[in-house]
Amino acid sequence: SGAAINISSTDDGIHANSDSGVLETGEDGKGIISISGGTITISTGDDGIHADKELNITDGYINVLTSYEGLEAITINISGGQSFVYAADDGINACTGDGTSTPLINITGGYVDVTTGSGDTDGIDSNGSYTQSGGMVLVKGGSSSGQVSGSIDVDGNITITGGTCVALGGICETPVNSVNAYVFSSVSFNAGSYSVKDSSGNEIISFTLNNSYSNGWICTSALTTNTEYTLYCDGSSLTNWTQSAGTCLLYTSPSPRDKRQS
């Protein structure tokens, strides 16, 4: 909390082990990482931040510039701060580990920006479920020839009850239990500054892309049923719609994605 840390490594940037007797005292490792402030910048050839059991981010500024997988643990809780992640494989990964815990990514606040590289990758990947009740999440995935990837990939469910999630890329799994969502079925997302505004010109959400995507959805508690909205890019209208309840699932081929988001 409060420090400025710069890490360059070939192995994991930050790692918390849960192996038996791993501590100098002979005690078992806890496998828990908690970040409550400060600035952390990581360039690594493996995981940016890896906790064998639990990763908790409540505040601070995290920038994973390069990694194989950005943030990884069985349970990942993000309630605050700003997290920017670039990964060659999965950006945020809730993986199976001890065989007794169900993987979960739970976001209740903060700002999260995830970009993945080319290939069979996922922006957010949970071997369990993904839940979000607050915060802003911008996740960008895609695919290369003969390989498929997604913005959010889960073995369980995507449940969004609050906050905002913008998902762009290849196969975009959509929430099963959520606040209002909208899937863009005929919009190509090119590089630029995007905003969603209501009919009175009030800005609901905004985000910036460095490259192009051909599939995406937004899910936010700021969308109101039976209200008209317009999506803009660099000030020009791309599409408009009247928000209705419910979501749909689309499969489309993605365009090249951001290679890096700084």
What are these regions (language model features)?
Residues 1-253, 257:
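A composition-driven surface/loop motif
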